[in-house]
Amino acid sequence: MKLRSRLTSALAILLATVSLASTPACGLHSEAPPAASAPAKASPAYADAARPKIEASLAETLAPGAVVWVHAPRLGDWAEAFGARTYRGDDKLTVDDHVRIGSNTKTMTGTVVLQLVEEGKLRLDDPVSKYRPDVKDHAITIAHLLSMRSGLYNYSESLEVNRALDEDPGRAWQPEELIAIGLSRPALFAPGAAYAYSNTNTVLLGRIVEQITGRPLADEMKARIFDKLDLTRTALPSISDASIPSPHPRGYQFGTNVDTIESMALSPDAQARARAGTLLPHDATTMNPSWGWAAGAAISTAPELGRYARALATGELLGSAMHEQRLASVTPNEPSNPETALYGLGIGKLGPMFGHTGELPGFNTFMGHDPVQDVTLIVWTPLDAAPDGKPPAIEIAKIVLGELYAGGAR
């Protein structure tokens, strides 16, 4: 099952890749802007350097394509689609194709929750049991859910959910079903004692939003985020809707959800067959994403996700005090090791960028914005994981960030 704790490993990869860029004194390697007479389609130098590496990465991960979208005023913007919409096909991807954004949805749910906190409709230190009597541990707070420090079991790691996804991919999951599975298992640790990525946390938050507002979470996201940012192609679909708006690619997955509960990597034999072309990925495009709901079911496009990522990281959707509190909450998942991944109130820190990653059957996404350098990066692929378990979009994001911040300490 994808949409699990990929974020943690992705953050670690990116921290190592762009560690030089994490200090404000390290500016982007600047270059002269293109002359007015330069060809309109000329790409920035960092894009020219990244392009062949991206193509090599796609060949390595077996992803059929990718979309890269960069807003970098000092170095030049770049938007490019690589590859095809279908596996071994000829229908070319475009930058404007729709994509399932997976766990990037968590930042949207988190933003709505923080807006409700600003409005005085709930508090970060409220016990979750105030709204959900089925959460028996009264020490678990709203903040614990947002920061992945509740200790609640992640329902999407259960054999029950993974087997159901393999046997009935079109099933429409009710949020309460997912919560019940998450709460049926013992807690992993005492609230606040550690970090553990769990979709149960975010689905609970989604239901609490609906309880407080009396409206569907999708409507709250639209009114509070999408409409405010003029995101007309971004939505949280209804639980019965497994479609993706056109245009869109097919989304692919190697292996089954049950096979990948413990590890994203296939067996050595299966990896060899995939690379030999005798084991093909299966089409997961219309797998109903309702099993992710508030934690991972949203759909968007690269340009709109880029617009949202910047608003998320700069505080456009929150008051200044709440935004500062949110960014300050982003701390190492292992306090004794500051080099580990960082996570806070519904937001992660990916190298110099605030944002998130997303992964669910068929799709892998990276979303980040660096508010110091005013750089936004969106990457997505229509393959969730390579046969060896590597996340294709994260591998490409690593390449692009490396080129963007090359020489950053000079």
Language-model segments: what does each one mean?
Residues L11-T23:
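Bacterial N-terminal signal peptides
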Residues T61-G65, R88-L145, F189-S198, W293, ...:
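Short active-site loop at a secondary-structure junction
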Residues G83, E334-P371, I378-T381, P387:
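Short, Gly/Ser/Thr-enriched beta-strand-loop segments that form substrate-interacting elements
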Residues A139-M353:
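Short, surface-exposed loop or secondary-structure junction motifs
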